[in-house]
Swiss-Prot record:
Descriptive protein name: 3-isopropylmalate dehydratase small subunit
Family: Belongs to the LeuD family. LeuD type 1 subfamily.
Gene source species: Cellvibrio japonicus (strain Ueda107) (Pseudomonas fluorescens subsp. cellulosa)
Enzyme Commission designation: 4.2.1.33
Keyword field: Amino-acid biosynthesis, Branched-chain amino acid biosynthesis, Leucine biosynthesis, Lyase
């Protein structure tokens, strides 16, 4: 998993509440269990004017020119500004996969659906909850200034605007450790590899009959 330390990223808007996981990545694209390749279909029903199909090339598909992610000013954005209850709906882990594959490293919102919130941390995506008034301010500043960038410092737990104003955010210490060090469930297990091997060696000596192979 990619580590997350400091991000200086262009911000893009998803200015609507209750964005569910089917809106983030529609159900017809959930056949793959690989974590890559979903970015082209992120917000598919909003980005395109036609109905997206699995394994379909997105080149030449008619774009919804009124959808912000299709605006030139938001190309290459890595911070998504969102509204309350982002990621509600079904528990599909493909939602953070699609956001990550598109290029987003962080989502800032007043609130998140619990399962989506947890899935983000497992996939190297940093969900940040800020007070609704602060999120409103960030939206206003972003709309007023093209090329609006936010600096996110995970170690310091701050979001800093181009004017230098900083806002603190809360994060569980264990999740913070995992993101800073790029540790998913497998990475966490490998951190304990020496202890696991030592236990297996000791257990084999204490109870060798458990390891006998029946021939």
């Amino acid at each position: 998993m990619k580590s997350f330390t400091v991000l200086d990223g262009l911000a893009a808007p998803m200015d609507r509440a209750n964005v569910d996981t089917d809106m983030i990545i529609p159900k017809q694209f959930l056949k793959s269990i690989k974590r890559t390749g979903f970015g082209k279909n992120l917000f598919d029903e909003l980005r395109y004017l036609d109905e997206g199909k699995p394994d379909q090339s997105c080149e030449g598909r008619p774009l919804n020119t009124e959808f912000p992610l299709n605006f030139p000013r938001y190309q290459d954005a890595s911070v998504l500004l969102a509204r309350e209850n982002f990621g509600c709906g079904s528990s599909r882990e493909h939602a953070p996969w699609a956001l990550d594959d598109y290029g987003f490293r962080s989502v800032i919102a007043p609130s998140f659906a619990d399962i989506f919130f947890n899935n983000c941390f497992k996939n190297g995506l940093l969900p940040i909850m800020l007070d609704e008034k602060i999120v409103d301010q960030l939206f206003r500043e972003m709309y007023a200034s093209e090329g609006y960038r936010l600096n996110i410092d995970l170690a310091e737990q701050t979001v800093t605007t181009p004017s230098g104003e900083s806002f603190g955010f809360e994060i569980d210490a264990f999740r913070k450790h995992c993101l800073l060090n790029g540790l998913d469930d497998i990475g966490l297990t490998l951190e304990k590899a020496d202890k696991i091997r030592a236990y297996e060696t000791r257990r084999r000596a204490e109870a060798p009959w458990l390891f006998d192979v029946v021939k």
